[in-house]
Amino acid sequence: MKVAKLHFTLVLFLAVTATTKAQEIPRSCDLEFPPGTGTRANVVTDATGNRITYLGGGIVARCIGQGNKLTADSAQQYESERRLFLVGNVHYTEPRATVTSRTMTYYQNDDHLHAEGDVVAVQSNGSTLRGPTADYYRSTPQRPLTRMFAPGRPTVTLVQKDTSGRGRPPDTAHVVANTITMEGDSLVYASGQVQITRPDLLATGDSAFMDSGHDFARLMREPSVQGKGTRAFTLTGGVIDVYSRNRQVERVVATPKGHALSKDLELVADSIDLRMQSNQLQRAIAWGVGRAHAISPDREIIADSIDAIMPGQRVREVRALRNAYAESNPDSGVVSSQRDWMSGDTIVAHFDSLVGTDTSSKPRIREIVAEGNARSFYQMKNSKGPQTEPTVNYVRGRIIDIIFENAKVATVTVTDKATGVLIEPAAASTGEKPGAVPTKTKPPATVKPPAVVRPPVVPL
């Protein structure tokens, strides 16, 4: 091996080594080292003529005509491989991004750099990646979008600028995952224990895709979305899509195996669509072949689809559509192992959603209406006997309307084709055993759900 120790200005060094290379691969990066930087060079040539140049004393390098810049404490240039290895306080800058690290390798042939050690990459829009290592691929005619690939569980801070024209400061979203890939200024792909933190929600999953240009995010593989604030909620499912506008989440859709849980309502269905405003749930829609369930501690509603209206995240109305069934605990004055129930083509439940002095209380049922082949079984306190022996009322009709007062049945109105039966226990003074309440009170499943159930048509 032939070793030549040369101490000269880099202008002369470039004149000797770079001119022929510039003609061989004209479309890739041709490095230049500006004069006047005090850089020292040591050139080593092996038996095959391959040259390795050791640079020290601080170096500055550029790709001719490409608007980028590399600085470091020292570097090694491998001419045959067209590769530059930089060590110590490495900085890479270009109009689209800046990258800093402890060490960096720049590959001239494909305009690609590999950074290691305390990597910080900042895009032109302010989004920042931090991690142990990263690969940055510059934009080229063959690769229009820049690309950043970072393993080793990096953290990305996405800057979400205000587009509403109100002059609000930008919000940020933090993404942590085992591997993150960024394309351009708006696309982010994350995989492996993904966590996304926004001012209004926390989202997790094993993989995620985010498109800030279209205010869209998708989470996959056991995803979960948790709303923040005083009235939080949680949504899980097979795949969760998040739609936003002006940095505010508007819709969160989970399918299949949707499960939504809030303070006032729990929903279980194949698909669940949550509508939001001001970081609070306003509406929840559930549907699917497997039937939709709306559950609370004292009530459950089942139907092909369910639409819950809940302004300010307090339930005001629940609509159960097609083959609807609802059951609830009996009145507070009744002790029974059976629950009251109601069925019909549709069931609409109205709640008192006004916020009182006790903001922790749940909305009380105010009215429930079943329409179309309606049936109802409910139990009332028996004035002649103990609480364990209630009066039983079973009615049928086209429409059944039940009004509640203080969570107790006040009136029952049956419209068209009204039939029914009232069963009261025998008086305690007769000594006879009170009449038994039929043990089977649930209506037979005479109507099977259709093979395919379409979601309800609701305004967006």
Give a label for each model feature.
Residues 1-6:
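Positively charged n-region of N-terminal signal peptides that target proteins for export
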Residues 7-17:
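Bacterial N-terminal signal peptides
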